[in-house]
Amino acid sequence: MQKTFDITWGFFPLVEFIVSSSNQIGSRYKTALDIGSGDGVHTEILRSAGLEVFQLDKYSDTAEYKEDFISHNFNHKFDVIFCSHVIEHQRNVGHFLDKIFDVMSDDGLLLISAPKHRAEVLINGHLNCFYSTYFMQQLIHAGFDLKNGKYLSCMGIENAAIVSKAKNFELSEREESGYIWTEKHQERSCIELVNQELHNLIAWFHNCTVLYPSDTQLQFDVHFPENYQSKAIDITAERHGFKITI
């Protein structure tokens, strides 16, 4: 049966993950945690793709965990952590990413997205700016592997990443400051870490196999693998004029 969902945020990492990892969902990736799940639409998309998904949202009546993510003590880990437009609300971004790292299975994936509005723009509840220059560094310092993972600069809409735990990360790094880039940081980065200016509003998909930049009006194309079997999921992002069946 065809299922239709409309979402505003998190469109890009969802499409890239579900299509590119289709053959591993249900085997390598079985369980997922949706942090800040809201009304649960992202959860339902992930469930329709074949994952067992748990919602965490202290403001939601449908969430399995109606608690604060930082304060809750989990008794197991998850293969996939999904976090769409939640990190910008955190007072302590590093602590938040540390907790995600700790509840994610050792060979799991983090799917995370954040808005990319200018730092000069004041938005209710947005305590942080996640232009790529900041977002990448936060993920790298928290021990996630951007070099071998996927980074998605989605035009003026959002930045996102699909990343695993970096093999060269040690928990003792949490005691370090962000004073200087180390060799380990360079090994985890998808760009050379040097003082530079990054263009924030372009379509750029590092290591992605489904989403590609294009010269079309949408600024991106979707390439399905040759033997891909559709999940019969229609996803629209009406606010941005996107629609896709995966």
Feature-to-residue mapping (PLM):
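Active-site segment flanking the S-adenosylmethionine/decSAM binding pocket
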Residues: 91-94, 115
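Helix-to-beta-strand junctions that scaffold the AdoMet/dcAdoMet cofactor pocket
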Residues: 90-91, 104-106
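Short "lid" loop at the C-terminus of a central beta-strand within the Rossmann-like core
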Residues: 115-120, 152-153
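Conserved S-adenosyl-L-methionine
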Residues: 144-155
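Conserved beta-strand signature within the Rossmann-like core of class I S-adenosyl-L-methionine
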Residues: 107-115
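Conserved N-terminal segment of class I S-adenosyl-L-methionine
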Residues: 1-76, 80-82, 95-97, 101, ...
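Short, solvent-exposed loop/turn segments at secondary-structure boundaries
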Residues: 122-127
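Short catalytic micro-motifs in class I SAM-dependent methyltransferases
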Residues: 84-89
